[in-house]
Amino acid sequence: MHWGLFSFLFVLWFAGPVAAQTSITLEASPVAIVDATINGRPVRLEVDPRMPDMLALSTPAAERLGVRRLPFAQVQVGIEGGGSMRGRIARPNIRFGERSARNMAGIFPVPVSTRADGVIGPGSLPYDIVTIAIGAEAAAARDIVLPLENPDAWFVQADVGGRSLRVLFDVANDASILNRPAVRAFDRDGVIPSAGELSERPVILGLSTLMQPVTTSLTVHGIELGPTFARTVSPLLGALEEDAIIAEGAASETPPTLTLGGQALLSAGCSSVSVNRRTRQLTLRCAS
């Protein structure tokens, strides 16, 4: 599995989550949170649309919740532009109310989340339709309906500045992010001039890195990108262990990717982003 933002390479492979049956709506204020139990203990999990269908826990959180690592099972996480980190695999008993989900869990020596006990991908939630409410609905609204390659992975392909980009959604952070392959392409086009000094910005799982602010008139389906940053070769920051991050030795092979930030969605009057697994479609409901 190779995503624009980060990728997961599993040493062992297990069955996916149980089939979803119904729908759930989560409020992104400021982040989407879902209540659950892990091994019978109540938890709050941050739902991140950029995550694949798995659960991520920090090492301290896993110890606190009594989540046992599987012997000889490891996971390697590659974060585009910043290297990779190794973690351990677990199969905790996760329940969402009356619904059970035997999700894959990765345990990593990084903060993961400051707002919740862990971070989970929306594709792990046992529901047919998962909706993340972003803001109030506009008086005149339109639905931007986009096909999904994988209904458990919330990314789409879209035209951005005449180029086909993989597009992800980050409702928890304001800024939109261009990964390094996208930066190289748009820099050649002259459409992302620098707009200031390098700034430390969050990436994912509690990690951050230095990024370059840029100005741009690029849009995706008529949505302006808002505050936008370009990934650089700066290392990842914030790991809990000194040797947790493995430096990237070769050029990234990830496709050009745009992560659309929360401010772009709010400025476009988007009230929600949702996925229907059965139709394999992602819908953005925004002002018309």
Regions found by a protein language model. Name each.
Residues 1:
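Tryptophan-rich substrate-binding surfaces of secreted polymer-degrading and adhesive proteins
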Residues 4-15:
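Bacterial N-terminal signal peptides
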Residues 19-288:
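Pepsin/retropepsin-fold aspartyl endopeptidases
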